[in-house]
Curated annotation (Swiss-Prot):
Residues 286-365 are annotated as: Disordered. Its main location: nucleus. A motif (Nuclear localization signal) lies at residues 106-113. SMART domains: FH. Residues 159-252 bind DNA. It comes from the Eukaryota. Residues 294-310 have a biased composition (Polar residues). Liver. The modification Phosphoserine is found at residues 212, 283, 303, 306-307, 309, 437, 458. This is Hepatocyte nuclear factor 3-beta. The lineage of its organism: Eukaryota, Metazoa, Chordata, Craniata, Vertebrata.
Length: 458
């Protein structure tokens, strides 16, 4: 400390003998021009803590050296701690190199400590840089913490992720009588979602447009319930309109049935000249299909097409009725197969591409039939209560098919294993055969064309 005080008492002209190169002044002045007050203040507090925790040699060396560097700085930094601005602006490597380069130009008493001082200062430089940037990061953190509050404040007024059909369905299902007037639907939506309290004319037009779909029915007022406007209720067949009760995604099965009913009605009116209603015709087709499958298929057995969805059974029955052919022509009778007969049936399906007992277009149907009966489809994920409700709309054999298919799907062996006992694996075996037949045919074809197998690249 005494040496430092003596050196600081020298005249400025004496310092020129210690700094032979003028670059030292230019580099320090450039650094001083680019420094800020915050970085120096943080470095001063940090350097004091570091010097207090360091050893005696290092703190003495750094103090002496900082006095030299501080004496060579511009007058604007003379009142601050020596060397604070110069070392705060340097990075780790640049600070170490700069201090090591200045070491030989210092006094002889400080030249042995040049390397040590460079190491100490170089290690502290990154922390000084980080602390000098900390006010900026703090402001950014405060601004980020402030944003979610405003976002959370306006989130309740955001548009809900439901379609208008979903909103109408929710309102009707949560009413005690399962029917609401148009004004009651409006009021329920506005009470639950504040977003719809604005621009009422726009979304109310969309609500009226959505009520015109086939999913909703208009119920006239009874004489004992006077008032204005008719009631609106859900279609009886649209009870499972949304997948697993989730109103974000709508199921396509009911939409498919509506389109097919309209197509069948148009085809019957133009070609057959029948005057029955579309609903009656669809029920007759469904009853005929169920009776045919029940009479031809023994108990515990399923035909290849019996596990198709109701939508496609309507399509197959309607097309066969319009053409004048019985519905049983598309699904031949199949006795209860033994394991040997199952293997023969699988080998027979793998053989010729055209089955003699089936029309050519029947080979293409099972591919999209089974898309609706995927193990993870909504039909197989339905609860037992929904299956019981589903069986009321259809005939009794559909309930038997659902149960048998559920037993097949819960069998631990999966698709490919043979079924022991009397439980038949009719649809599963046929599905495996139909899925494997084009692959086997293509493999044999390409093996005949090329001299070696396709997958063998060697």
């Amino acid at each position: 400390m005494l040496g430092a005080v003596k050196m600081e008492g020298h005249e400025p002209s004496d310092w020129s003998s210690y700094y032979a190169e003028p670059e030292g002044y230019s580099s320090v002045s450039n650094m001083n021009a680019s420094l800020g007050m915050n970085g120096m203040n943080t470095y001063m507090s940090m350097s004091a803590a570091a010097m207090g925790s360091g050893s005696g040699n290092m703190s003495a060396g750094s103090m002496n050296m900082s006095s030299y560097v501080g004496a060579g700085m511009s007058p604007s930094l003379a009142g601050m701690s020596p060397g604070a601005g110069a070392m705060a602006g340097m990075s780790g490597s640049a600070g170490a190199a700069g201090v090591a380069g200045m070491g030989p130009h210092l006094s002889p008493s400080l030249s042995p400590l040049g390397g040590q001082a460079a190491g100490a200062m170089g290690g502290l430089a990154p922390y000084a840089n980080m602390n000098s940037m900390s006010p900026m990061y703090g402001q950014a953190g405060l601004s980020r913490a402030r944003d979610p509050k405003t976002y959370r404040r306006s989130y309740t007024h955001a548009k809900p992720p439901y379609s208008y059909i979903s909103l109408i369905t929710m309102a009707i299902q949560q009413s005690p009588n399962k029917m609401l007037t148009l004004s009651e639907i409006y009021q329920w939506i506005m009470d639950l979602f504040p977003f719809y309290r604005q621009n009422q004319q726009r979304w109310q037009n969309s609500i009226r447009h959505s009520l015109s779909f086939n999913d909703f029915l208009k119920v006239p007022r009874a004489p004992d319930k006077p008032g204005k406007g008719s009631f609106w209720t859900l279609h009886p067949d649209s009870g499972n309109m949304f997948e697993n009760g989730c109103y974000l995604r709508r199921q396509k099965r009911f939409k498919c049935e509506n389109e097919l009913a309209l197509k069948e009605a148009a085809g019957a009116g133009s070609g057959g000249g029948k005057k029955t209603a579309p609903g009656t015709q669809a029920s007759q087709v469904q009853l005929g299909e169920a009776a045919g499958s029940a009479s031809e298929t023994p108990a515990g057995t399923e035909s290849p097409h019996s596990s198709a969805s109701p939508c496609q059974e309507h399509k197959r029955g309607g097309l066969s009725e319009l053409k004048g052919t019985p519905a049983s022509a598309l699904s031949p009778p199949e006795p209860a197969p033994s394991p040997g007969q199952q293997q023969q049936a699988a080998a027979h399906l793998l053989g010729p591409p055209h089955h003699p007992g089936l029309p050519p277009e029947a080979h293409l149907k099972p591919e999209h039939h089974y898309a609706f009966n995927h193990p993870f489809s909504i039909n197989n994920l339905m609860s037992s209560e929904q299956q019981h409700h589903h069986s009321h709309h259809h005939h009794q054999p559909h309930k038997m098919d659902l149960k048998t298919y559920e037993q097949v799907m819960h069998y631990p062996g999966g698709y490919g294993s043979p079924m022991p006992g009397s439980l038949a694996m009719g649809p599963v075996t046929n599905k495996a055969g139909l899925d494997a037949s084009p692959l086997a045919a293509d493999t044999s074809y390409y093996q005949g064309v090329y001299s070696r197998p396709i997958m063998n690249s060697s």
